[in-house]
Structures are given as structure tokens and as C-alpha cells.
Regions:
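Conserved class I S-adenosyl-L-methionine
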Residues: 1-42
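Class I SAM-dependent methyltransferase SAM/SAH-binding core
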Residues: 47-51, 55-102
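A conserved beta-strand element that flanks and buttresses the S-adenosyl-L-methionine
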Residues: 113
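Short catalytic micro-motifs in class I SAM-dependent methyltransferases
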Residues: 116-120
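A short glycine-rich, Lys/Arg-flanked "PGG" loop and its adjoining helix->strand segment in the class I
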Residues: 128-140
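Conserved beta-strand signature within the Rossmann-like core of class I S-adenosyl-L-methionine
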Residues: 141-149
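C-terminal alpha-helical "lid/dimerization" subdomain adjacent to the S-adenosyl-L-methionine
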Residues: 149-202
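Core SAM-dependent methyltransferase catalytic element
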Residues: 197, 203-226
Length: 226
């Protein structure tokens, strides 16, 4: 992801996203806790994939909660990988500058985390390819925690929700201009829950179970079918 105008994205990404997304500060902790309680990843020394590690929020939390996990962190951005590596013990994590589609790690992981990645992919086969690759990388029965911006359902409350989101940003102290935030808020491809269900089923997962929601941002627990 390119940096917003006037910002060094890896340095300020976490602060900006906390001001944009309600509950973001707790997301990494919740995602790791959910995966740590899963049947496969609860075992000592479980192999866990962080797909799209960004600046390392999920990795930091995983190291705090489950220092025994064998972590693999992937991101197509060398800049983001470098930012993550500055926050963590580089030697204790397997780092790969790649996408999950090119990882070639079939059945290698007991669990996986993907936070704010799927939303950036168009629904032209790219979302399905991403989800299929994630399912393929998991052991049968392995779980994925997926968090993304979702398309709003038709609701008479939608305008109120949008106004609340703007109010949240202002109350959080977000000072950036809209054009500065464009890479974080525009060019995204959110989908509705029905479409997500169809895609994850086609990819090899069971139905998504919602485990988090804050305005338009939702988290789901997915399990690879046997």
C-alpha cells in the first residue's frame, strides 16, 4: 500500500488506522486470542501464518500471547516488512516478501490471520484466489481470522452510521485531509456478507462466523473444511 501524501506510512500507519477504525487497537489482541483458542493453533509450537503483516501489529500481539508459535509473516511490500522487522526479533520469525497465492505452502499452517487485506482486492477472481490460497495453506480444520471493511447492507440507518464514523474520526484526533488518506480509504472493494459466504465456501472454508463488528468493519472466524 502506498503512503498517503505527506506521511511515511510505516511510521504512522498504526496511529492513523486507530483513528479511522473503531476498536482497531484491540483487533490484533482479539484476533490472536481467537486463533490461540482454536483446536489446531492451540497446540504448542503451532505454525501460524500472518498474511499481509503490514507494520506488525498482529505479530507483536502473537509474540506476547503465544511466544511458542512458529510464525511466518508475508507481505508484498518490502517497506512494510522492514517496518515489521524493526519492531520484532527478526530471527524468531520467517519473513517472506510475497503474496499468499505465491507462497506454495500447502497444508503447512495450523492457523492464519488476515487483517484489512481482502478489502483491497477486486472481486474479479482476485478475492477468490486469495481466499483459496489461504485455505490451501491451512491444515484441514485449521482456522483463519479475517477482518475487513464490509459493504453496507441497505438500511435506513446507513447515513447515521456514516456520520458516526466521521464523528469517531474527529473525536479520535484525526487531522489528515481526505486526499491524504485516499490510499487507506479509497480504491477498496468491500463486499457484503452473502458474497463473502459464497467466496469462502468456494475457497474451501465453512460458513463465516462473525466475531467482531465496529460500524462497517467486521471480523470473521473461518475454518477450512476437512
Amino acid at each position: 500500500m502506498s503512503a498517503p501524501l505527506g506521511y511515511d506510512l510505516p511510521l504512522c500507519y498504526d496511529l492513523i488506522v486507530q483513528q479511522l477504525i473503531p476498536g482497531y487497537a484491540s483487533l490484533a489482541r482479539l484476533a490472536v486470542a481467537l486463533l490461540a483458542a482454536s483446536p489446531r493453533a492451540s497446540s504448542s509450537g503451532a505454525a501460524v501464518l500472518v498474511a499481509g503483516c503490514g507494520t506488525g501489529a498482529e505479530l507483536v500481539e502473537a509474540r506476547a500471547q503465544r511466544p511458542d508459535w512458529q510464525l511466518t509473516a508475508i507481505d508484498p511490500s518490502a517497506e512494510m516488512l522492514a517496518a515489521s522487522q524493526q519492531r520484532l526479533d527478526v530471527e524468531s520469525i520467517s519473513w517472506r516478501q510475497t503474496t499468499v497465492e505465491d507462497l506454495n505452502a500447502d497444508g503447512c499452517f495450523a492457523g492464519a490471520l488476515s487483517v484489512l487485506v481482502l478489502q483491497s482486492l477486486p472481486d474479479d477472481g482476485s478475492k477468490l484466489a486469495f481466499l483459496t490460497a489461504l485455505a490451501r495453506s491451512l491444515e484441514p480444520g485449521g482456522q483463519l481470522v479475517l477482518v475487513d471493511l464490509m459493504a453496507p447492507e441497505r438500511s435506513t440507518l446507513q447515513s447515521q452510521v456514516e456520520a458516526a464514523w466521521m464523528g469517531f474520526q474527529q473525536a479520535s484526533g484525526l487531522k489528515a485531509e481526505p486526499h491524504d488518506l485516499a490510499p487507506l480509504t479509497q480504491g477498496l472493494h468491500p463486499i457484503g456478507e452473502a458474497r463473502l459466504t459464497a467466496l469462502v465456501n468456494a475457497a474451501g472454508f465453512g460458513d463465516p462466523a462473525r466475531i467482531f463488528q465496529a460500524l462497517g468493519y467486521e471480523g470473521f472466524l473461518l475454518q477450512r473444511r476437512p
